């Protein structure tokens, strides 16, 4: 029995039928992103028939032959960079092409002289995405100053705002980024506030989708980061790098690729450590060491025209949580967190002639996060942050009834105590494990007028958790549960597992209505259930989406888009009984499990316009959200869980310019204005809403203005120079020292205000050495802007990194 939203039952029944069909795959949610590589081959201005076309990339070698019109088509091509070789009696050609979701269409003139280089394909703007979609190839990823850091790479995307400890907020959303790796999404069921879901050193190609999402995409909508991982071609060989720099940082990577039978194997290992892993609450960075160990394997096996791809990634990260000495935390506090992630996917692709493909396969993820508290010092720190009297935690209840089946009855709050989330000190020891399995099936068929796609996905999640939240000595629970020691600390344990199931079906079509118009339309159905020992509930939604595009030649277009989105809440949360027990002074009954999925209506217009040799993309979006999802903190601990606001509004306007430079270089610039507000906190599970105003309030991740720009210039000797710049107007703050821009219609009313405006630059120079090696010199935050990433914010106080240097040596940069 489900507690609400029973109107989703018909959809759920249909989706469960599909889940049985897919059960034999026993894998995880997947959304295969493949494209079409096509082109026309000529010689002496005449079409060339029978030319042999070979495309090598993504661990694959794909082949085709031109027809009588000189045209070739390779369907079902994974996104990535490809070396294309064309051979015919009339001549040959060799070029390198980046293939993104919209595909690539080449026009190649054969020559008797072989010319090798990278082509910058000029084709109509991406028709399936938004005005600010972009791709990052291997050169952009490895030669950017942000290389090696996923947050630093993401912050260069249009509409990105820097949050604390590696969190990145894109397009006004809290952080709901959808990562898809080699066709399979990475589940994100644990509430992770530090660290990254995937190691950036294992990425060879990124397609970043920013909006106008077709029906195949679901769950998270700040941005879709479609990743093609490490791949190899040619003779077996090594690749690697070694970097050392500020704060004792050491970062080393060693990779190797080889052929095994008809297949290609790529393996890589990364080890990283240093003394500044997170953004500390104080100007300096005490107790802030970190480490990261990552192992990666990819094996791709062609079987005739088909291929099978296996991807395995494992990481183990450790973090010391920085101490807030200025806020009263003892300098010798030793709070730590570890994160362990194993992700594997197996994808099978079958081309259907030259006009379609079928993809399916399983994936699996196991994530474990452990928190290790320091009770004595945690209590000292928490007591220092209590705004009331030292005895308020002990005196928070005037009386209570007997304990019945573990439930404290009839709690009566003490009216003389102004109890809040910081009245008591907490210490957390936590161990949470999420296991995700499921299956997928995706089909696409291309014709002259239509590109039809449909598919189904299923995932099952089991979250096992053990929370031990200990209240300070002198608390309101010990006299009730342990009356013999009324002044002792008391621990509230929560070991209730959560089990969730998500099923989705989608169908979408691209209708090419002549040369000037195109209609993309589709519908997606989502069904989501979650149950535990104390609750069971389920939800569903049908989400129509449509995008109409008008083309003005090959490089100019405008579009209008409407879509409905459905975002499930995280499957990690505090149980109702534990939430009630921790909040007895605020609750009179056991907390209800009242979390809801977020439901959005999205309106978007945009386009692409030729500007010189480059492309100017424009995107204007309005999102109206019901039951907007945010998160809240459990005391002063690293334990977070989702909450809902009754309404949310996000408006963003972005202009993004990009142009290719010589030798695969690039220049880009993005300017974004964002407005993100929410209203009416409605979640009582952790009592975060008592005393919170009900009017529109800027979200804690609301940054009104951001501007990013960057350049990668490659020289003739194989070296390069890269520079990135970022300006942000600052995130929301409850305080306003210095009269920094505040909220309100005119930007001058009282808080939440904005702290702190910042302008930073990072630069890297690569010097080519003999044998494909390179020496790298990098400076981050060149002008040493020591700004607050967050200040008096729901995310706490966090300082940005200072100026930092590193020097490195790379092996096999070609």
Give the role of each language-model region.
Residues 244-273, 282-319, 336-357:
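Transmembrane beta-barrel wall of Gram-negative outer-membrane proteins
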Residues 105-108, 150-153, 168, 193-196, ...:
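N-terminal periplasmic accessory domains that precede
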Residues 16, 301-304, 337, 698-814:
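Conserved C-terminal beta-signal and adjacent last beta-strands/turns
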Residues 513-514, 620-626, 641-737, 783:
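Gram-negative outer-membrane beta-barrel transporters
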Residues 184-210:
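Short acidic/polar hinge/loop motifs at secondary-structure boundaries
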Residues 149-186, 204:
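Extracytoplasmic beta-strand/coil segments of soluble accessory domains associated
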Residues 40-46, 52-58, 87-90, 100-143, ...:
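Short, acidic, small-residue-rich periplasmic hinge/interaction motif at the N-terminus
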